């Protein structure tokens, strides 16, 4: 399957495909090889039942804090954000340091804060990025974040393990490799690493939030 064009909401394929609702699309050969993300780490058994070799069915305390609405989207509210914030700190004994959501939810949360803007200024992070200020913690937007989700994260419980840093494959003596049957060359950039979490219960995933 080859993608020939992409817009903000539509991907055009070279040939027609039959997909069903809730099907997933992956970059070729990447499924199962990507770094574990927060959707799998801050989970119970919906997406990842065994994390870092630990079964969450056997050890439920290795699951994240989940606030959902049984699959029915509801509006994001400041009270709901506060509920998730406190649940992570009370039930998981975490120290929340960061909120993450989609751009649509980030915009909606900003609008909810607008009446109190002079009391809740935005925050400027390293690199010049701007974040919303909630309980003196930054909320940032992630362009790759799954829709209808918000995360409160205890960053101190996350770590990244690296086997090899970013590098080009040159095992045959060359970085560029001829593409069979085409007047083209390609290169392979690799990075062997994994995201890990020592205590997923310190973070919370608020699910089923309306993006519209």
Task: Identify the role of each PLM range.
Residues 1-212:
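Core alpha/beta structural scaffold of self-assembling particle/tube/pore-forming proteins
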């Amino acid at each position: 399957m080859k993608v020939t064009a992409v817009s903000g909401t539509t991907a055009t394929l070279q040939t027609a495909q039959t997909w069903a609702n809730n099907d997933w699309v992956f970059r070729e050969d990447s499924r199962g090889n990507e770094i574990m993300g927060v959707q799998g780490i801050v989970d119970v058994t919906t997406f990842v039942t065994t994390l870092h070799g630990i079964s969450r069915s056997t050890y439920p305390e290795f699951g994240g804090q989940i606030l959902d609405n049984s699959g029915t989207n509801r509006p994001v509210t400041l009270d709901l954000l506060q509920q998730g914030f406190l649940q992570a700190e009370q039930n998981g004994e975490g120290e929340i340091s960061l909120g993450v959501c989609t751009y649509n939810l980030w915009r909606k949360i900003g609008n909810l804060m607008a009446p109190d803007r002079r009391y809740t200024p935005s925050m400027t992070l390293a690199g010049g990025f701007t974040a919303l200020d909630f309980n003196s913690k930054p909320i940032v937007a992630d362009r790759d974040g799954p829709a209808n989700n918000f995360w409160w994260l205890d960053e101190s419980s996350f770590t990244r393990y690296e086997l090899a840093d970013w590098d080009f494959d040159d095992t045959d003596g060359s970085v560029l490799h001829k593409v069979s049957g085409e007047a083209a060359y390609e290169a392979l950039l690799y990075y062997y690493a994994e995201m890990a979490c020592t205590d997923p219960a310190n973070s919370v995933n608020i699910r089923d939030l309306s993006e519209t």
